[in-house]
Curated annotation (Swiss-Prot):
Gene that encodes the chain: infB
Chain residue ranges for the region called Disordered: 47-338
PANTHER family: TR-TYPE G DOMAIN-CONTAINING PROTEIN (PTHR43381:SF5), TRANSLATION INITIATION FACTOR IF-2-RELATED (PTHR43381)
Region of interest (G5), ranges: 596-598
Protein name: Translation initiation factor IF-2
Compositionally biased spans, kind Basic and acidic residues: 47-59, 124-157
Organism for this UniProt entry: Bifidobacterium longum (strain NCC 2705)
Biased composition (Basic residues): 325-334
High-level lineage: Bacteria, Bacillati, Actinomycetota, Actinomycetes, Bifidobacteriales
Length: 954
């Protein structure tokens, strides 16, 4: 059977499709359009609902139009209609009679049959002699009609029922079939398997039917009562009353007249020889003479025919009582469908609107993470993002900008957690709260040495000053005479006879080491700005001032090289005033000290000024009894000792054997060394120390902390690695939008120089990479760093360079013999550098060499046509006089006529001087020129020759 469509049902019901759709929505069935199909059970429910609505509006006029009919005599009860045939017409008096009071006995009408109930057998009599046969025939009829219970129920529900006190006239099936049928006013007990409620009341503990104490069950199969025995007492029933014709039968009110539609408990009859009332509708518990039949609640699921009073078989669609799980699931599914219908459609998919709710995601999150947070399908988010012009997969890491665009479209406020907040949340999982540790009691705080950073322009004498203070010669060991890494030292000076310790950080002055200088400014307490008295303020000097002021660090200015001819310290003071550093002698608060690091002049005054500034402006105290916290100043990979990190302890005390975490590196402290290489057992606040025992080389600037054990340290490092990897993927993800897809495709044609960088320390590698990425030669070429690392050049580096055709740059590192041989066999170029600016110069030259050559046109000669010779074999031959330059065979030329180029891109195919073929003819000589198949030449034309020459790219 084909499923009906909405518009087809509308035609059958004589209404429009819109009304049908609204009715289905009220019923809980959500249909998309008028052409949608619906299930047959839903169609039956829809027809019943429309029939019920029509009955409410037409019931009163129908009752007024009914013709009056006389009450049937008692003899009509012996008539024999077809078994199980329902009554066709109700009594006309039903419209004018009132229902009796519940519980009050009413006279039993004679000869009446209840509509919708099977009539007695064909040969049924009202005497005791025929009662047994009548009962047997009733049971046979019940068994025959049981398979048609569903049809009978539907047929009964569509027929009107008269009140208890109204006489009912029995009609034969062959009677007036066209008489109108009153519609049922209450809920019909249907058996629709797709309906959540069957129209009947589920009994509760307060209204469950209780059997009469004197009653015993009968086997009426839900249809009729057993024959009564004389001499028994009088039974009085509630609810459904048997509809069998008899004398003096008195029963309770009909179902639906009481509050809860309780099941009937038998229709009563008096006197011997009186036939008991038949069973009520589908379990109405009838039975004369105190006999009760089995029944079912009037508002619950109809149960099958069984032995009365002992419970019946389960219904056709499950056991009675309670709501099935299928019904609950259908209700939830309908609710979900309804919510989806209300959700906005974006790009063809429905996504619930967030209404501006805020949701937090980690750095490098993907669409899968967002889908899990807001409980939507991943594919739907991918579709929405594609609709917005962005192409990404569900597991691809996205940046913050993409998430903001997506959130504005779907109504969510998406916020990405910053790296600092995410790291704090991670540490809190391991009971490490950095914010609480900063709140220390004054009793636990003890004085610590100040951390002083020496900053300034390159070659202004920073390292020389530290050598003078430490009485060493570090500058002699620096390649190129410049500092290329941060050095951390601790010295002891005497201030007013008291020994005081000062921790010094020596930062590079070269412009390539901007990150190192910024990192040094963040770790320091006091900054010494070294300015050469002869050079004055230079670019890196200004940068160092900005770093120190951004970190809110007090500055002490050391005017160096005052012994050099041409030194002008006053000029330096005037220049620095423009940057907010006003000397004390000018009324400011910045201390200036004129020194000579080379001659060791006034260095002690500089140290005194540093200590005075630290004591006056800073509270240099720390808790040495807590777990160590600090920062990584520098890190490198040592061949014999592994990863070596130079750390500065800021809080607590670091001991040998502590489990530490530095960024994504972790390990246990195997040994600690000071700046002179001497072992140490403990390092307190403001102490620089070299730490051995880390599993990998940390990044310069990473904070380090002591964990409870190795397991916690490893878990913290691994989670940081996962977070950093996701953030890098999101940062490096190339967002390909539909608008600039062609532009991205054109950029793929750019020639890229792939580079692998290996260095001796993480700071040097970072500085070299930043410097190389700043090189701009042309839009046609670019640099791509495919790998960087700390340590010697390995076989993996060579293999990676082989695949990507990259150049390996070794900064203060070398490969072993086997790796060098492999690189030579594979044709991989390895360049070694010890000074950073030389590497920058070579890479810039390589990029210029990758540029495509440019050509320019150079005119080589002009020749005037003075004679034209015509040849049947060669065509026209121009006799010319070379006016300037030199004419060569095979060169490009053009014809100039009256100063206008008539034809371009011609070629001199033949060049003769008299009868000889020549390669070239110089200025002042005559020659014969043949231009191939081109013959449009005239006297006085000028033949101009030119050639394309390559121009050097700058």
């Amino acid at each position: 059977m084909a499923k009906p469509r909405v518009y087809e049902l509308a035609k059958v019901l004589n209404v429009d499709s819109k009304t049908v759709l609204e009715k289905l929505k009220d019923m809980g069935e959500f249909v998309k359009s008028a052409s949608s199909t619906i299930e047959p059970p839903v169609a039956r429910r829809l027809k019943a609902e429309f029939a019920k609505d029509n009955a409410k509006g037409d019931s009163k006029p129908v009752q007024q139009r009914r013709p009056a009919a006389p009450s049937a005599p008692a003899s009509t009860s012996s008539s024999a209609p077809t078994p199980a045939a329902p009554a066709r017409q109700a009594s006309p008096a039903s419209a004018h009679q009132q229902a009796p009071t519940p519980g009050a006995p009413t006279p039993r009408p004679q000869g009446g049959a209840r509509p919708g109930m099977p009539t007695p057998g064909r040969h049924g009599q009202n005497d005791n002699r025929e009662n047994g046969r009548d009962n047997r025939e009733g049971r046979e009829n019940g068994r025959q009609s049981r398979p048609n219970d569903r049809r009978n129920n539907d047929r009964r529900n569509n027929q009107g029922r008269p009140n208890n006190s109204q006489p009912v006239q029995h009609q034969n099936n062959r009677g007036n079939a066209s008489a109108p049928r009153p519609h049922a006013q209450g809920p019909r007990p249907g058996n629709n398997p797709f309906s959540r409620k069957q129209g009947m009341h589920t009994p509760t503990p307060g209204d469950i039917p209780r059997p009469h104490p004197m009653a015993r069950p009968t086997a009426d199969n839900g249809r009729g009562g057993r024959p009564g025995r004389p001499g028994q007492g009088q039974g009085q029933g509630r609810g459904f009353r048997g509809g069998r014709p008899g004398q003096g039968g008195q029963g309770g009110p009909r179902p639906g007249q009481w509050g809860h539609n309780r099941p009937g408990q038998g229709g009563g009859s008096q006197g011997a020889g009186q036939g008991g009332a038949r069973g009520g509708f589908r379990g109405g518990q009838g039975g004369g003479n105190n006999f009760q039949g089995g029944g079912a609640p009037s508002n619950g699921p109809a149960r099958g025919g069984g032995r009365g009073g002992r419970g019946g078989a389960a219904g056709a669609f499950g056991r009675q009582g309670g709501k099935s799980s299928k019904a609950r699931k259908n209700r939830l599914a309908k609710r979900h469908e309804y919510e989806e219908l209300k959700a906005p459609t974006i790009g063809g998919v429905r996504i619930p609107n967030g209404n501006g709710q805020t949701i937090r995601l980690r750095q490098g999150a993907s669409l899968a993470d967002l889908a899990e947070k807001i409980n939507v399908n991943q594919a739907a988010l991918v579709t929405v993002l594609f609709h917005l012009g962005q192409m990404a997969t569900a597991t691809q890491s996205l940046d913050e900008e993409t998430f903001q665009i997506l959130g504005e479209e779907i109504g969510w406020n998406i916020q990405l957690v910053s790296a600092e907040e995410e790291d704090k949340e991670l540490l809190q999982q391991f009971d490490i709260n950095l914010d609480e540790e900063e709140l220390q009691d004054d009793e636990d705080l003890k004085p610590r040495p100040p951390v002083v950073t020496v900053m300034g322009h390159v070659d202004h004498g920073k390292t020389r000053l530290l050598d003078t203070i430490r009485k060493t010669n570090v500058i002699a060991r620096e390649a190129g005479g410049i500092t290329q890494r941060i050095g951390a030292y601790q010295v002891t000076v005497n201030l007013e006879g008291e020994p005081r310790k000062i921790t010094f950080l020596d930062t590079p002055g070269h412009e390539a080491f901007t990150a190192m200088r910024a990192r040094g400014a963040e770790l320091t307490d006091v900054a010494i700005l070294v300015v050469a008295a002869d050079d004055g303020v230079m670019p890196q000097t200004v940068e160092a001032i900005n770093h120190a002021q951004a970190a809110k660090v007090p500055i002490v200015v050391a005017v160096n090289k005052i012994d050099v001819p041409g030194a002008n310290p006053e000029k330096v003071r005037g220049q620095l005033t423009e940057f907010g550093l006003v000397p004390e002698e000018y009324g400011g608060d910045t201390m200036f000290v004129d020194i000579s690091a080379k001659q060791n002049l006034h260095v002690d005054k500089l140290l005194e000024a540093v200590l005075l500034t630290a004591d006056a402006e800073l509270d240099l105290r720390a808790n040495p009894d807590m777990d160590a916290r600090g920062a990584t100043v520098e890190a490198r990979l040592d061949k014999g000792r592994g990863a070596v990190a130079t750390v500065l302890v800021q809080q607590g005390t670091l001991h040998v054997g502590d489990a530490i975490v530095a960024g994504t590196s972790y390990g246990r402290v195997r040994a600690m060394l000071d700046e002179n290489g001497q072992p140490m057992e403990a390092a307190g606040p403001s102490t620089p120390v070299q730490v051995l025992g880390l599993t990998s080389v940390p990044t310069a600037g990473d904070l380090f902390l002591v964990a409870s054990d190795d397991r916690a340290a490893r878990q913290i490092a691994e989670k940081r690695q996962a977070t950093e990897r996701a953030a890098q993927l999101a940062k490096r993800r190339k967002v390909v939008s539909l608008e600039d897809f062609k532009k991205k495709f054109a950029e793929s044609e750019i020639d890229m120089l792939n580079i692998v960088i290996k260095g001796d320390s993480s700071g040097s590698v970072e500085a070299l990479e930043d410097s190389l990425m700043k090189i701009e030669v042309s839009d046609e070429v670019g640099i791509q760093v495919i790998h960087r690392g700390v340590g010697a050049i390995t076989q993996n580096d060579v293999n990676l360079a082989t695949v990507d055709k990259a150049v390996i740059i070794g900064f203060n590192v070398r490969p072993n013999r086997q790796v060098a041989d492999l690189a030579e066999r594979e044709g991989v170029e390895i360049k070694y550098y010890s000074v950073i600016y030389r590497a920058i110069e070579d890479i810039e030259a390589s990029l210029k060499g990758m540029l495509k050559p440019e050509y320019e046109e150079v005119v080589t000669s002009h020749s005037e046509i003075r004679e034209i010779f015509r040849s049947s074999k060669f065509g026209n031959i121009a006799g010319v006089m070379v006016q300037d330059g030199e004419v060569k065979r095979g060169t490009k030329c053009r014809i100039l006529r009256n100063g206008v180029a008539t034809v371009n891109d011609l070629e001199i195919s033949s060049l003769r001087r008299f009868k000889d073929d020549v390669q070239s003819v110089k200025e002042g000589y005559e020659a014969g020129i043949n231009l191939g198949t081109f013959n449009d030449i005239e006297l006085g034309d000028i033949i101009e020759t030119f050639e394309m020459r390559e121009v050097e790219r700058k």
